[in-house]
Amino acid sequence: MRIELLLKGAYERLNFVSETAQLDAQLLLAHVLDVSTSYFYTWPEKQVSDDNIRVFDDLLSRREQGEPVAYLLGHQAFWSLELEVSPCTLIPRADTERLVEVALQVLEQTDQTPTTRILDLGTGTGAVALSLAAELPHSTVIGVDLIDGAVELAGRNATRNRIRNATFLQSSWFDALQEQAPFEVIVSNPPYIDPDDKHLSQGDVRFEPKSALIADNHGLADIEHIVATAPDFLAPQGYLIFEHGYDQAAAVREYLTTRGFTKVASFQDLGGNDRVTMGQWTQV
């Protein structure tokens, strides 16, 4: 079957389950054929073998069931990196790049040295940690995650992207970090979804690990814990920077202010929602 006909049928199948049906189909077929998507515009009349059609059909069926394209491909672009992904971690999303941007802005305003240390809590694929490490090659970045599989995955992503100034440890938040502190900046994209949120039964998140998505107290329990504990691991004048839910900024700002952080501020994502909040620890 010709590429153009195969893709046309795939668009029709995925159009009922995905808002990005055309892109999904092209990415999946490019993966099967080991070509770029531009190949389809250059060679639409090329024939696809029966074996490749069967593999493509299997991927389409899985996508029809809602399985995320990133899991089907096994990788996802984030910042300037190409990251391996797996069902043991969240899929890196564009909104989380805002967390990287804010952290870089903060670090640009500080006196960076070769001893500048950055901590990423709940690192998952290592997306945030590795993006910061890539942009700040003279810094030391440590990423931690509770899940051993995530720690191993983040390490592979460091190797894949030739990043040597980031290391990854297994830890439940700060538990294994006593000897690693202090840090000039602590960043985190923690679980922040309410366990009763209806969106957990919709879209890609149905296939992502719930432990990386949900938190008690309306999604704020892990954020509360991090805010309470972070000062013990921050350097003087250090910053704590979070990603959080679109409707949680006011609560996060209150937690930070009550704990004694200063320069508390929130930053919007691409959709105009307050998505990242930071505070500086100035107490001795």
Residue spans of the language-model regions?
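Non-catalytic accessory regions of SAM-dependent methyltransferases
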Residues: 1-33, 38-41, 48
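Conserved hydrophobic residues forming the short capping helix/wall of the S-adenosyl-L-methionine
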Residues: 14, 107, 158, 230, ...
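Residue-level signal for inorganic ion chemistry
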Residues: 28, 66, 96, 128, ...
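Conserved AdoMet
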Residues: 30-105
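Conserved SAM-binding loop
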Residues: 92, 120, 143, 215, ...
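Conserved SAM/SAH cofactor-binding pocket of Class I
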Residues: 98-199
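Mobile active-site "lid"/loop adjacent to the S-adenosyl-L-methionine
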Residues: 181, 192-222
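Conserved Class I SAM-dependent methyltransferase catalytic core
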Residues: 217-281
